[in-house]
Amino acid sequence: MDNYTLALNCNHTTHGYAHYVYSTLSYLVFIGNAPGYPNCENCIYDITFNSTSMLNISNNYFHIANATLGAPEYPEQPVTLSVIGEESPWVAWLAVHTPDKNYTEDANTARAVMRVLDPFNISWCAVYNVQSVDPTDTQDISNCTEVSEELPVNNQKSSIHLNTYFLNSTFTVSVSLNASNISSQCSGNVSLENMTSNVHIPCPTLPLTVSVKASTDNMQTGAAVNASIDIGWLLQNLTDASLTVSSSPGNLTQKNCTTYKNISKTDRHVRDENLYVLAQIPALEGHKDSFTLTRSPILLNFSRNSSEFQLVLYDRNSSCVWANPANGTDTILVSMSCPHITATISPRGEIKVNVTGNFSRNANLSLAFLSSKGKEYAGVLLQAFEPSTRPPPGTVAPGILSTTANFETSTNKSSPTYTPTPAKLSTPPGLTNTLLLTAGEHNSGIGSTLEPLTTVSVQVLQTPSSPTRDTSTLVIKLTTVPQDHKTVSPSLVTPGRTSTLPIVSMTHFSREGSSPKPQTTAAKTSSEASLPPLLTTTPTPTNTEKSQSTFASSTVSVDTTFTGDDVNTVGTMSPSITQTLPITPTSGRQYIVVGCCTLNRRSGNLFFFFLFVAAHRESGHNTSMPNPHHNSVKPEDHPHHPEGDHPDADHHERFQIWLLPIAGTIFALVALVIVNIALRMTE
């Protein structure tokens, strides 16, 4: 594989220069365009290096598997992987030695390529134009100020404050390292042209990474700039080391030089507190472990609570980093260069990422989520995205039926109340209707004890797709599921672990020109299921009117008393799932949409399941609705039409008799799959 092919097989590729010195040990350092990656149990970093110009590594590949952060496991491995600082990029570096200057390289073809495949399955490549440089003269440090205080090295990183410089100025920075086995230096010019500057200075003969950071709040020429130099220590076993740092303005009339001989190294990382478990998301479809993911906007639900975390997103040309300050509040965080990506992060676990840029179909967007404390999870998405076409939050696009839940609960002993926020639907006739179920937020005090009474009220607005009568049924079922409950059946019945409540209220939509009345009965046995008259096997004949009302609405209220220790203490309500499925009402078919939101309790979760059964379309004759509990229709449940009715009535009836049981069975299986997926995504 040549250098170009290797680079093309990377998700992210950077270009730069690799400098080396003849007859001297040189360090080729690859700096990853990413924040510092965490320590992982059994993390694998696959590192490949190839060069066409260096004698001792010409046309060779070095593949490192099971590379760990820090020193390599095997001394013969030429590449070392390490993390500089707690938040700074990780680096992969290679020590090379070119013993002879007789080897000449073509400046147009002398290249080196390093490829790193990280534990998130993101590939990073650096393509270097290789250049040889002459050794620099040893710096005169006789006039430098020797500092007796310690120079701390925390997690292989040191930061040294420079004297104040000014915007639009240029100065020179030099670094010298003297140790028992190393004595060399490097220097570079730094130009402060922007409010924020981060200049990397290549030091090929030093096992150091050197960069200068500067920032100012004033863009006027001559404004004071705060500057510092960051030193990354690649080697950890240096003895009798001293570091000299000097800086001077462009006119060289002034020079500030400091020597540090007391270098103290510490490592603040506690491995047991910085372990990560990786969860791969290879595509939009399929099992996503602890995550839910939808397009436009990207919705990433992280099911575990975490007070501090990082969210890292990359496209091909830039990287973005968000970090939660752990202040316990919802925060919209933006940083670095993210012109096409914004993120809203809730410390209660929900992350919404909006991608609005003109990403091409061939572009990759890498999405990585890192939690910073404890054994948390990380995920990655490598997928091409197009600009977002969804409306802003809080609005409903044409063809979207939205039911939004807002939980409001006081800390005194009162009932938590579900307050519906209805949304109008304006679907033109014949277009697909969509039921969109979203959850609001509940901010009750953790562990506050409330009366064991919960009232749930849902309001749904529906636009019929034709002037004929449409009848729909909305079914609400409540149950409690323990937090450690992994799988449930569609009925959510698990003996000894789940308290299942019967359906206590049902309603229907009608085209009678007025809002239908909810049918509410007392809770009965599961066989009776509190069915309203609409769903009884003996239909009541009615005269169908072709009303031209805009929409019909209905409200379903459920009042029930919860018992048991697992449901009488309210925790917090967090957004859980937004499940969107298309519904196209068709005569004689059932369509079921399941959505749920979660009310977290101390030892259990309260799930609200919404089942929407699409309308039967009646055309001058009576048709009973199928029983949604069984998701099937018996032939004897349908009345026979009298003679003299529509000539196609008998054929239509026989069609429904055979079609409905098949459709019911199919959609029962669909409901089972949706419920299980929804529950997995809320874990």
Curated annotation (Swiss-Prot):
Residues 407-427, 509-556, 621-648 are annotated as: Disordered. Residues 407-420, 512-529, 543-556, 621-630 have a biased composition (Polar residues). Residues 633-648 have a biased composition (Basic and acidic residues). The lineage of its organism: Viruses, Duplodnaviria, Heunggongvirae, Peploviricota, Herviviricetes. It is a single-pass membrane protein. Residues 531-542 have a biased composition (Low complexity). It comes from the Viruses. Keywords: Host membrane, Membrane, Transmembrane, Transmembrane helix. GO terms for cellular component: host cell membrane; membrane. The chain crosses the membrane at residues 657-677. It is found in: Host membrane. This is Uncharacterized gene A8 protein. It comes from Alcelaphine herpesvirus 1 (strain C500).
